[in-house]
Amino acid sequence: QAGHDIYLTLDLKLQQYIETLLAGSRAAVVVTDPRTGGVLALVSTPSYDPNLFVDGISSKDYSALLNDPNTPLVNRATQGVYPPASTVKPYVAVSALSAGVITRNTTLFDPGWWQLPGSEKRYRDWKKWGHGRLNVTRSLEESADTFFYQVAYDMGIDRLSEWMGKFGYGHYTGIDLAEERSGNMPTR
């Protein structure tokens, strides 16, 4: 019979718990099993009642969903594209170590900001007075932004893009959901 060979990895209690935590907010949470890649929970809020579509949605209800400033029809978990923030740092570290751009012993001084050569703009670290002299291990421990700005700059956009692509940046996850969007990974 149709559908009898479909097996889900969703954990219903975890899914419901996350939905409760996110109630009233605009957010997304995806929880996966690191051993299998199976999706344990995938939550996007706000959501909507899918039963509205079962027998054909009224134009009034559909207009309300389309015009809702909280955009409940957008699945933030699969269609949202977000800056990776500090989660990118371990990948930059592995990439730079593997490419020979840095070693475990490479140190850089972090004054609390980083400046792109030829630019006046300073990119501030979360710790405004800086972290001082850091190697890659300490930079990860302290989540030092400027260390990774410099290392990424030293890698160059082509090499950085190639390495980040190996970790899945800029690619689809393969979750088998038609609405999924790939992330952005800049290239030259």
Model-derived regions: residue spans:
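Beta-lactam-recognizing serine transpeptidase/beta-lactamase-like catalytic domain environment
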Residues: 10, 35-87, 91-188
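Conserved, well-ordered alpha-helix/loop/beta-strand core segments that scaffold catalytic motifs
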Residues: 1-28
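Short hydrophobic alpha-helical segments used for membrane anchoring or interfacial signaling
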Residues: 29-34
